[in-house]
Amino acid sequence: MGTASRGGSVKAEKMPEGEKTRQCKQETEQQQKEDEREGLIEFYGSYQDVFQFFCSNTTIHGAIRLVCSKKNKMKTAFWSVLFILTFGLMYWQFGILYREYFSYPVNLNLNLNSDRLTFPAVTLCTLNPYRYSAIRKKLDELDQITHQTLLDLYDYNMSLARSDGSAQFSHRRTSRSLLHHVQRHPLRRQKRDNLVSLPENSPSVDKNDWKIGFVLCSENNEDCFHQTYSSGVDAVREWYSFHYINILAQMPDAKDLDESDFENFIYACRFNEATCDKANYTHFHHPLYGNCYTFNDNSSSLWTSSLPGINNGLSLVVRTEQNDFIPLLSTVTGARVMVHDQNEPAFMDDGGFNVRPGIETSISMRKEMTERLGGSYSDCTEDGSDVPVQNLYSSRYTEQVCIRSCFQLNMVKRCSCAYYFYPLPDGAEYCDYTKHVAWGYCYYKLLAEFKADVLGCFHKCRKPCKMTEYQLSAGYSRWPSAVSEDWVFYMLSQQNKYNITSKRNGVAKVNIFFEEWNYKTNGESPAFTVVTLLSQLGNQWSLWFGSSVLSVMELAELILDFTVITFILAFRWFRSKQWHSSPAPPPNSHDNTAFQDEASGLDAPHRFTVEAVVTTLPSYNSLEPCGPSKDGETGLE
């Protein structure tokens, strides 16, 4: 193997000064171009870079002050506090705006419309329940018990007050009927002063601390309570009505009304100066208000009014005699009238009023329509389909329809029978104490819970979004007048072939008409829409920062940059921690084992010889520093 000298020198060839300067300049420019070249994704190296770039380039007013005044710490602190305070005030205003928006306020719009008006439905009742001739046998027993009760409590003999001859006959007949009633219903009898017998679970009028009421007990008589009244008249009527309902429940459906029933009650009917006919009304029977007739309820041919005034409305002459009235059930005379919208049931006890005999009652109407916003703006319902109460009426949804249906459904569920005044649900039967012994106790308990809204009916039944109401005002005058009553009564008796014996107390006249041609519509519109919200937010942003939508995007970009750099720094910290905690790699098989375990405690170091062939090195002009050296040459000695 050949040998080589241990030493030597390599001398580089000297490059001209101009060439070296030119080459260094080219390399510097190339490096600057590489530094200025922007990649597809570039990012900041620290939070300070992000914040400084944002403050230097944003269009938000005041942000540049945080950078420009960095040499003055007092100004920097002042502008920082002012910037944060401004942001806080702005977002406080934002919170107020959002709270107002999500409260869903509405504006009330009042419109006055002029158009042909559809005449409402009008229901008129006789205030005469089932006549004595229809259920006299069923009522005799109840009358005798009531007569005896009045005699016990007030020392008033009702039979003698009416007529002496009929009183003796009625008393004998009632006694036989009462005995027959007790034999047919083998219940426990309760002795009273004059041996008046009452069924065991039948309410009985009682006198306690000058309060009149009746006792109601559960089926096993373990729980009883007094339904008391401050007025004896109210107590007797309520008690009588309770038994009257039981009598109606034991009877088949009300008899069909024919044209003679209508003519016996309605002497004359005109609308828009035209005579009414049978196609203009429907009829039904109310347990307390008697035969009822509803005019203009046929949706296929509704009446319309082109002009206001008494001559362009409905005019009725009705009979108000009380020859066959039930005195213990009906204590008023006349007729009862109610104005309501089509396809709505007539709840006479809620919205009706009485018409006096011998009086012409003129009722003027003003139509009002209400349209509410549904959804988030109000708790109204469009058609009741979203209300958790079954509609028992064959009519459209109203709040009163829902409330009564709710009570009836709870009545069937709790008492196992239905209240006679309300529609009958499928599969149920009306309450009758011959079948449901303690239904009265259950009913009055349930009624108290209903009035206190324990049943939740008032909460479940929501208002409809669209309603039509009629504002009524009435005027009264004597009819007919003293100078014209003779010929008026004569003509009515000849026309209807009926002899009016009581004259003035036997008839009444009713006029129902529109007061004005206009009708009012109360509507709702959103008071704070999305457009209004965005406008208010923009106004607040411009007020506090004088910026635009793009400034908001800059702020969103800043938040995104802070999020990304936080993720990057966290990722770097995690990788660095993982790299420092990893063990050293094992030595490779080609490594020189002479350098392993150098400090293992050996006595003498290993000796080795390295032989190399030294040749002349090439010239590396790029390694020379740009600019002249001290000696004017570059090389290795």
Curated annotation (Swiss-Prot):
Catalytic activity of the protein: Na(+)(in) = Na(+)(out)
Name of the featured protein: Epithelial sodium channel subunit alpha
Molecular function GO labels: ligand-gated sodium channel activity
Subunit structure: Heterotrimer; containing an alpha/SCNN1A, a beta/SCNN1B and a gamma/SCNN1G subunit.
Side Cytoplasmic, residues: 1-76, 570-637
Disulfide links within the chain: C125-C292, C217-C224, C269-C276, C380-C465, C402-C442, C402-C461, C406-C457, C415-C442, C415-C465, C417-C431
Topology in the lipid bilayer: Multi-pass membrane protein
Listed Basic and acidic residues bias regions: 11-34
Region of interest (Disordered), residue spans: 1-34
Record entry for activity regulation: Originally identified and characterized by its inhibition by the diuretic drug amiloride.
TM annotation in the entry: 77-97, 549-569
Extracellular side: 98-548
Known tissue expression: The long isoform has been found in cochlea, colon, and cartilage. The short isoform is only found in cochlea.
Family matches, as Pfam families: ASC
Subcellular location: Apical cell membrane; Cell projection, Cilium; Cytoplasmic granule; Cytoplasm
Top-level taxonomic group: Eukaryota
Family per record: Belongs to the amiloride-sensitive sodium channel (TC 1.A.6) family. SCNN1A subfamily.
